[in-house]
């Protein structure tokens, strides 16, 4: 979880003074602290789903400390994102590059109108063990 959670006002990307806008315009402010970087029993997971919203065409930067703080060696990593209008773009490959380890797969983008059935159908179609 994010230590200093974003409020609705923080997420107002149309306001140049909102938290996300300030962070977007100044990369040095994108170091978003997490309450915990590595999930419990991390070493037991073979497959990891990494979900995030798209902000300005890239993965939302709060996910960066999770990616940088974990070793994905020996893990299959499947990115997915949400966005009202942007596609997945290069976000998954940029995260894979940032991680430097793991077997990163093609990801999926879900629109704001996606249902739990849409997500379940995608996951079931991955034919994971």
Predicted segments — roles?
Residues 68-74, 98-99:
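Short, conserved loop/helix-junction motifs that constitute active-site signature segments
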Residues 78-114:
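Short, glycine-/small-residue-rich phosphate/pyrophosphate-handling segment
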Residues 1-2, 88:
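Generic structural signal for well-ordered, non-membrane alpha-helical segments
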Residues 55-57, 84:
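A short acidic, glycine/proline-enriched capping/turn motif at secondary-structure boundaries
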Residues 3, 47-51, 78-81, 106:
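Structural recognition of the beta-strand scaffold that forms the well-ordered cores
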Residues 3-50, 57-59, 64, 68, ...:
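N-terminal beta1-alpha1-beta2 submodule of the flavodoxin-like/Rossmannoid cofactor-binding fold
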Residues 43-48, 73-76, 102-105, 129:
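Loop/turn elements at helix/coil->beta-strand transitions in domains of secreted/extracellular proteins
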């Amino acid at each position: 979880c994010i230590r200093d959670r974003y409020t609705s006002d923080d997420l107002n990307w149309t306001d140049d003074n909102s938290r996300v806008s300030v962070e977007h315009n100044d990369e040095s402010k994108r170091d978003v602290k997490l309450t915990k970087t590595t999930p419990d029993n991390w070493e037991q997971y073979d497959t990891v789903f990494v979900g995030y919203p798209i902000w300005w065409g890239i993965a939302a930067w709060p996910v960066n400390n999770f990616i940088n703080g974990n070793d994905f060696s020996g893990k299959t990593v499947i990115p997915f994102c949400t966005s009202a209008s942007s596609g997945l773009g290069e976000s998954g490959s940029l995260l894979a590059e940032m991680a430097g380890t793991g077997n990163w797969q093609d990801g999926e983008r879900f629109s704001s109108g996606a249902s739990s059935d849409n997500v379940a159908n995608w996951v079931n179609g991955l034919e994971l063990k």
